[in-house]
Amino acid sequence: MNRSRWLMSIGLALSQAVLLGCSPTPDPPPIPFAKKSGEQYSDKVDLARLEHESPLTPADLMKITPDNLKGATQEQVDQIYARLTAGPIPGGVYDGQMFFPKGSSERARLAEIVGGGIKGFVVDRKAAKLEHIGEFIWKGKVFYRSEGVLRNRIEDLHALKPIVGPDVERIKKLDVDGKDAWLLFPAKLYCGQSLLDGRRESVIIDYAFTDDLPGYREMPDVLAGREGLEIRDEIRMVRPGFYLGRAYMKKVFALNFSLYNQEVADKESPSFVGSGTINEDCWVGNQRTTAMASKAGNQHARLTETR
């Protein structure tokens, strides 16, 4: 199967996986949001002012979950993301979920983004088990913090065998909760400017130039890189063990995703709630964050102060 077919197949799979897995939409996180933006550019939410007037306290952040994010509109998800900092670059295994916010039209145009600019492709829905491909890149990630590298956790190699080849079993394998998982689609980790909110950095997950990483395989790893989907992710920490991410394909925003590590959450959340402080690996910008006590509930807010 040629590369163009696989790129389009992945795009179709992403849309199909979400549509087949639809469930009742939950309510959005019960936290403060700015009013909905108007149609004019001048009516858009000022993210710096929003954070100054309605900072998210640790208590607010504890109310956000991977599930209730799916009940928020894209504008609400953006407002949450803009009030977060990068936090520490993660380390270890994280479970991932991609999601399309309430009222979003991303499902309909995702395959269009993936297929844009690819000439001569033939849409072949029977080319692979599309439902398995849909969440490959955002299903789960393994962070090698000290190396500045990330690899994606694949739990079913069957759909990839036609392009990986007969030596598929040589791909590095690890055990996750008693299940076999394979590591593919490497990416480089670093701090960089957010494409949504340039006031501070995010943790960047970059698939563009990864052919020099140990274990790189031209197929299928090239599909996520500069000659394929040109995927670039960015993440910020909601609270310990929980990150909110934005995925871009071909420089166009494509979808949101969440990453969660239960062990880290259980271990570090109590101290976070009590102190409101975290370690920051990335630049937090001129609108710096500090821990301050809330008079009402003695909660500590990650408040912003303009220098």
Placement of each model-derived feature along the sequence:
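Bacterial N-terminal signal peptides that target proteins for export
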Residues: 1-10
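Soluble ligand-binding/transfer domains with enclosed cavities or grooves
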Residues: 27-305
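C-terminal motif of bacterial Sec signal peptides marking the signal peptidase cleavage site
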Residues: 20-21
